[in-house]
Amino acid sequence: MVHWADYMAEKIIKERGEKEEYVVESGITPSGYVHVGNFRELFTAYIVGHALRDRGYNVRHIHMWDDYDRFRKVPKNVPQEWEEYLGMPVSEVPDPWGCHDSYAEHFMGLFEEEVAKLEMDVEFLRASELYKKGEYAEEIRKAFEAKGKIMAILNKYREVAKQPPLPENWWPAMVYCPEHRKESEIIDWDGEWGVKYRCPEGHEGWTDIRDGNVKLRWRVDWPMRWAHFGVDFEPAGKDHLAAGSSYDTGKEIIREVYGKEAPLTLMYEFVGIKGQKGKMSGSKGNVILLSDLYEVLEPGLVRFIYAKHRPNKEIRIDLGLGLLNLYDEFDRVERIYFGIEKGKGDEEELKRTYELSVPKKPKRLVAQAPFRFLAVLVQLPHLSIEDIIFTLVKQGHVPENLTQEDIDRIKLRIKLAKNWVEKYAPEEVKFKILSVPGVSEVDPTIREAMLEVAEWLESHEDFAVDELNNILFEVAKKRNIPSKVWFSTLYKLFIGKDRGPKLANFLAALDREFVVRRLRLEG
């Protein structure tokens, strides 16, 4: 089965024709924290660009920061005093936290740092800078000249939606008052570069389109941008792709006003966190950021989550027990890619998903420390990072001859596993080694089995986990001890719970002499 990004790349080549360079675009208004749902737009554009690059084409990925949009409302986490900045460009509203040059920069800066960790070739542009240096001046003037055409297009869709037509004094743009920087009403245009405006503070004045104070309204700005940059592909959320929405009107405006065709698009669904109710909102503050994911996920896994889901399927990221399954799945796909494991009829698609989840094709499989087991090891207080690596080698989870690249990856996973246990792991996964035996009285038959395991461990300084596992089963089987009762007793003995991690691996990771003493109920 063809990966969806490859399908889209082929469609772009077919419909847009062979080009020296294809342009893909994504865009976000930095009105609040840019969360993992917003990131889906950028990643969808990126991965289609990735597929085009893999076919030998040059690709320019523009991510447009719509930071010349107006500040519409004061978010819950911002002081109410910021009401005085309503109507100003978000790029000119002060940063409430005082650490960046503006409100918009606070959110843009963080997101750009987060994206850099994914090694994605993206060119971040700021709409405020492009408007202010007059880059869009010609296109803005064209929109003024085509005011009648634009109104006719918009009114056609408004009629279908049973909305009243636009008023005769409507203009395809608005002005930021040069003095107060508030959104102002346009009241006249001189037919060339001059635009007359009325400021909400009460005064009137003229401004030149080329001075950067005139900004196109969203339904005109979007198609203008497609034309200006020659955009071939831009994904969009379903609100922008519904019938009569900004994509529909944009297709007609770019053709009628700018003489070009709209880019191809893909609708992407929401991204949420499993167990979280409602839609994430950067201005409401109920969000998960990429930096939150980086606390528990390798960058490759973050990319993998988005690459494996078709854009029209909602993503629910499970930061609980499901995260262990995600690591297992990613490691399996990685082994399939390197031919170490066979797929189940889906081999080629899985390999391609993996390729699109990494910035460049890796030359070898870097050591995979099983995250599920690391979540156990990081809870053993006597183990240092070096001890954990030694345990992984000893139990055969990673090779003996580790390169620095291997060690770096293992250390990263250790850190991520520790974070996961502290922040997201359910109680059933957490445990503490008891300072005294969790059981004081044991059935004589079970006690006998415990002593036999203790004797075996005492006489085997070096052993394989499989050998210990076999002994654990054998001593119980020959005494007709039910497995559930036997294992439950051992878990209670060490961690005071009925259940726990894989027992043989767990016991093998503990100090051997301590395990022997505990099995003998000596401490």
Swiss-Prot record:
SUPFAM superfamilies: An anticodon-binding domain of class I aminoacyl-tRNA synthetases, Nucleotidylyl transferase
Cellular component per GO, a single term: cytoplasm
Subcellular location: Cytoplasm
Renumbered ranges of motif 'HIGH' region: 30-38
Details of cofactor binding: Binds 2 Zn(2+) ions per subunit.
BP GO annotations: lysyl-tRNA aminoacylation
Catalytic activity: tRNA(Lys) + L-lysine + ATP = L-lysyl-tRNA(Lys) + AMP + diphosphate
Family matches, as Pfam families: Anticodon_2, tRNA-synt_1f
Cofactor(s) this protein cannot do without: Zn(2+)
Family in the record: Belongs to the class-I aminoacyl-tRNA synthetase family.
Protein name per Swiss-Prot or TrEMBL: Lysine--tRNA ligase
